[in-house]
Design a protein with these regions (language model features):
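Terminal amphipathic helices with adjacent charged low-complexity linkers/tails
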Residues: 190-217, 394-422, 429
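Extended, well-folded interaction surfaces typified by the phenylalanyl-tRNA synthetase beta subunit core
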Residues: 415-575, 708, 761-763, 773-794
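A carboxyl-terminal module marker
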Residues: 2, 19, 27, 441-444, ...
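Beta-rich nucleic-acid/ligand-interaction surfaces
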Residues: 39-43, 201-205, 265, 488-489, ...
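Glycine/proline-enriched, intrinsically flexible loops and inter-domain linkers
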Residues: 4-5, 23, 57, 63, ...
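Mobile "lid/hinge" segments at catalytic clefts and subdomain interfaces of large enzymes
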Residues: 114-131, 135-141, 155, 163, ...
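Conserved mixed alpha/beta core segments that line enzyme active sites in large multi-domain catalysts
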Residues: 47-77, 150, 245, 256, ...
Length: 794
């Protein structure tokens, strides 16, 4: 945002130098990027008066002029301009002067006659025909009507005796994209009063506004407010010099008085405006609507714009006449013979304007301001200021009244002033009275301890925002450096984190490496693991903006993630791997926006020495390390992802806590893995509910252990787990461990049966076991096996 220091002085009186101003404003939070003098390029150019003219003796088109430059003796200057006469006031570039572009003017001779400078045109001073509409295009700029004096610096005449300050405005301060907003900031920073100006409109033009103009805001969700006034009997002409100079200082090209007024108000108030030629507004009706079926609009820059149905447009009864908040239409442009004008001062939804400007590739000054969601309360003072300027310039007759369509209810915003919390946050000791004073300087009143936030300050919503304002005017450089203070809390792990760390450590101790995979997977992963089409696990959380099809849903099973990594390792010729992961799955809940996010722990392995029982033993070891209740394994022949003869459910305390087995050969083939792949999945979240009481450590046994072996004959369908559970139940307190050491099928064993051998260890804590003790336990075990399972001793 660029502002003129001269223009700024209309609102706030400050005498600071440019350097002082930049420093104070930057320290107050409004960073100054650069400050440039407008007169930096023009040096030693003054107003001169042509005293006499005579023909050049060696040229038929040149004149030798004697010019009074206000420095005493007249100087001789040779010119070829034909529009200069004796008595004219003209710009004179004297000896050793500089013009825009680095042009250096010195004494010289033109066809043998000495010339001590140059008479200048407006173009040579860096101006355009819009800056000087009354000047000759190809002649010397005659200054007779400019109210200047001989010897006066030409920079003063053209308004270059000014500094342009460029501010870096953050998007949360839309009020500072205006001269008034920055004047308010300046007044607060320098602690001086701001000069407010309330527009005064005389009005009185003939006619009834409500009969001539109607406004229909159909897209009220995109247009919180629309204000319009009408001016009759307009006289299109160049703007006065002072207005042209101010617009030029803001980087805006003057066009004509009506258009210049809209731009002037935009700079001053930060409220974009537009002027329509009333005769081209068919039916005298302005409709604010979406483009709908309208396909194109030719904008003021002469380009045909292709409209999208949801773009906001300003239309009359039959056609669009402007792109709302971006640019007006060529079909309602202000031209030289315009008689009646409608001033639009509206507020549009920032996101809608940003979308339109981006789609059409036409970011204008207006759209840039609307994108920031400017204050809807600006529309009325802005349109009144425009009408006031019309009357000031004598550019037309303003009609009484206005049309103001308000589609929102202003909600007062208050924030409690909390001095103690603010001081604690800033590390200061500022009194409440000083805080109130800092806020008053910004025109933010405090009533009964409550801050009344003005409509133009959308950035003030919570205590931290208020603390920032206090710090700005107290001075960041005045805040002393202090050590951090406050209560500290010792860090620690939650029970879930402790269990996760322990599980990971146990897995790594067994040679497993941890992997971390994405929670986003492809829908095709369900087919890859042969998940049934009607499985509830196919109901997923879908991403709105996925990176691609392969990462378009949140996983409901963790198996595909493990198989992807195993497949990659197999493709890289890794002969054997052991991997584990603890990760979340995402299970949608009916009627809930967010899914359940239980954790799963999965183990995956392949290689020459890997098999079902090795993995089972490792799972038992990990569960034992975690102090989980003992697990039993129940055969599962229906899991489609696993081999039907080598899969079991992991059951703890009667609850299914996971699955273990060999991956189905078809699934392994889909993932490009040759050989046998073994996987175990655990409900890690559920494990927390089946933890055993804390371990009690006992002293080393004082009495010996007795070992006995049992070779049992059972049905082929009977599992080791069933036998082991029965033995433990019958063995009582004296039975310390049961270890499988052999499974035999062959001669001596009937068809359909198998021999399973266990090693049992017996021990008492208070005595040495006798043969009777040992025999009693073994007999009890054999009887239990025979009665419950029909198992006999081999």
């Amino acid at each position: 945002m660029n502002i003129s220091r001269k223009w700024l002085r209309e609102f706030v009186d400050i005498t600071a130098t440019d350097k002082e101003y930049d420093s104070v404003m930057t320290l107050a939070g409004q960073k100054v990027e650069t400050t440039e003098r407008m007169d930096a390029e023009i040096k030693n150019v003054v107003v001169g008066k042509v005293l006499s003219m005579k023909k050049h003796e060696n040229s038929d088109h040149m004149w030798v002029c004697m010019v009074d430059c206000g420095s005493g003796e007249p100087v001789q200057i040779v010119t070829g301009a034909q529009n200069v006469h004796e008595g004219d006031l003209v710009p004179v570039a004297q000896h050793n002067s500089y013009l825009p572009g680095g042009i250096h003017i010195t004494k010289g001779k033109l066809r043998g006659v000495e010339s001590c400078g140059m008479l200048c045109s407006y173009k040579e001073l860096g101006l355009t025909e819009h800056d000087c509409p009354e000047a000759y295009a190809d002649g010397i700029w005659i200054l007779n009507d400019e109210g200047c004096e001989v010897g006066e610096d030409v920079n003063v005449v053209i308004g270059n005796d000014d500094s342009i300050v460029e501010f870096e405005i953050t998007n949360n301060r839309p009020d500072c994209y205006s001269l008034i907003g920055l004047a308010r900031e300046t007044a607060a920073a320098f602690n001086v009063p701001m000069k407010h100006h309330e527009p005064v409109v005389k009005g009185g033009a003939e006619g009834d506004l409500c009969e001539l103009l109607d406004v229909d805001v159909q897209a009220d969700d995109l247009c919180p407010r629309y204000t319009a006034r009408m001016v009759r009997n307009v006289k299109i002409a160049p703007s006065p010099k002072w207005m042209r100079q101010r617009l030029r200082s803001a980087g805006i090209r003057p066009i004509n008085n009506i258009v210049d007024i809209t731009n002037y108000v935009m700079v001053e108030y930060g409220q974009p405006m537009h002027a329509f030629d009333y005769r081209y507004v068919k039916g005298g009706k302005i409709v604010v609507r979406r483009a709908g079926e309208d396909k194109t609009l030719t904008t003021l820059d002469g380009n045909v714009r292709t409209l999208q149905p949801d773009m906001l447009v300003i239309a009359d009864e039959t056609k669009p006449v402007g792109l709302a908040g971006v640019m007006g239409g060529e079909n309602s442009e202000i031209v030289d013979d315009t008689v009646d004008v409608v001033f639009e001062s509206a507020n549009f939804l920032g996101s809608s304007i940003r979308k339109t400007a981006l789609a059409l590739g036409m970011r204008t000054d207006a759209s840039a301001k609307f994108e920031k969601d400017i204050d809807p309360m600006l529309t009325v003072p802005a349109v009144n200021r425009a009408c006031e300027l019309v009357e000031l310039l004598g550019a037309g007759e303003v009609m009484d009244g206005m049309i103001d369509v308000l589609n929102y209810v202003p909600q007062p915003v208050t924030v409690k002033l909390e001095p103690e919390r603010i001081n604690a946050l800033l590390g200061t000791d500022i009194s409440e009275a000083d805080m109130i004073e800092y806020l008053r300087r910004e025109e933010v009143p405090v009533v009964d301890g409550m801050i009344q936030v003005p409509s133009w300050r959308p950035d003030l919503r919570v205590m931290a925002d208020i603390a920032e304002e206090v710090a700005r005017y107290y001075g960041y450089n005045n805040i002393e450096t202090t050590l951090m203070r406050g209560a500290t809390t010792m860090g620690g792990y939650s029970d879930e984190q402790k269990l996760e760390n322990a599980a990971g450590a146990a897995a790594r101790a067994l040679g497993y490496s941890e992997i971390i995979t994405y929670s986003f997977v492809s829908p095709s992963s369900f087919d890859a693991i042969r998940l049934p089409a009607d499985s509830p696990l196919r109901k997923t959380v879908k991403l709105v903006n996925p990176l691609g099809e392969d990462t378009s849903i949140m996983r409901t099973v963790i198996l595909p993630s493990m198989l992807d990594i195993l497949s990659r390792n197999y493709a890289f010729k890794n002969k054997g791997v052991k991997l584990y992961e603890i990760g979340k799955i995402y299970l949608p809940k009916d009627g809930e926006k967010l899914p359940d996010e239980p954790k799963r722990m999965i183990f995956g392995t392949y290689g020459e020495h890997e098999n079902f029982f090795t993995l089972k033993g490792e799972i038992d070891a990990i569960l034992d390390q975690l102090n989980v209740h003992p697990a039993t394994y129940i055969a599962d022949t229906k899991n489609p992802s696993y081999h039907p003869g080598r899969c079991a459910d992991i059951v703890i305390d009667g609850k299914k806590m996971g699955v273990i087995g060999q991956i189905h050969p078809l699934v392994a083939e889909t993932y490009g893995i040759g050989g046998e792949v073994y996987v175990a999945e655990l409900d890690f979240t559920g494990l927390q509910a089946v933890l055993a009481p804390e371990r009690v450590f006992h002293s080393l046994p004082k009495f010996p252990t007795v070992s006995r072996d049992l070779a049992l004959v059972c049905e082929e369908s009977m599992t080791v787990g069933m036998l082991e559970a029965c033995i433990k139940k019958a063995g009582g307190k004296l039975l310390r461990s049961v270890q499988l050491f052999d499974i035999y099928r062959g001669p001596g064993i009937a068809p359909g049966k198998k021999s399973i051998a266990f090693s049992l260890e017996l021990r008492a804590d208070d005595r040495t076991l006798t043969d009777e003790d040992t025999t009693g336990v073994m007999n009890a075990v054999l009887e239990k096996l025979k009665n419950d399972l029909g198992v006999s001793l081999r």
